[in-house]
Amino acid sequence: MKGLGSTIVRSLPNGARLVCADNTGAKELEVIAVKNYVGTVRRLPAGGVGHMVFVSVKKGTPEMRKQVLPAIIIRQKKEYKRADGTRVKFEDNAAVIVTPEGTPKGSEIKGPVSKEAAERWPGVSRLAKIIH
């Protein structure tokens, strides 16, 4: 796992619903924890593009539902600033389900993947068709 080069806005707190952008059988995910989050008192843990989060599968196949799994956020609606000054935002909030080491469980990723997530997680970038 590599460090992030951009200033990522942590806009997805606990309870946020994400679209599952892979073919594992999950359709909708809910963030329940953010890995390595260190916050202040009374602040909800939040993640952004490129962060690993733990999610609960809310909609999907009966085998996938109600499971708690690690996932990587690949898109977010809230714009964030890159090191070169450009601002990036996507149409939806999306994540892919991964193993604890960071390799994707699915065999394809639907839609674009942010450049920050692709650089940080090589397994995700291998499956990405569009890196934006």
Curated annotation (Swiss-Prot):
InterPro entries: Ribosomal_uL14, Ribosomal_uL14_arc, Ribosomal_uL14_CS, Ribosomal_uL14_sf
Pfam families, per database record: Ribosomal_L14
Keywords attached to this entry: Ribonucleoprotein, Ribosomal protein, RNA-binding, rRNA-binding
Origin: domain of life: Archaea
GO cellular component entries: cytosolic large ribosomal subunit
Membrane-spanning intervals of the chain: none
Family: Belongs to the universal ribosomal protein uL14 family.
Assembly information from the UniProt record: Part of the 50S ribosomal subunit. Forms a cluster with proteins L3 and L24e, part of which may contact the 16S rRNA in 2 intersubunit bridges.
Summary of the function given for this chain in its UniProt record: Binds to 23S rRNA. Forms part of two intersubunit bridges in the 70S ribosome.
Protein name: Large ribosomal subunit protein uL14
Organism name: Methanococcus maripaludis (strain C5 / ATCC BAA-1333)
The gene coding this protein: rpl14
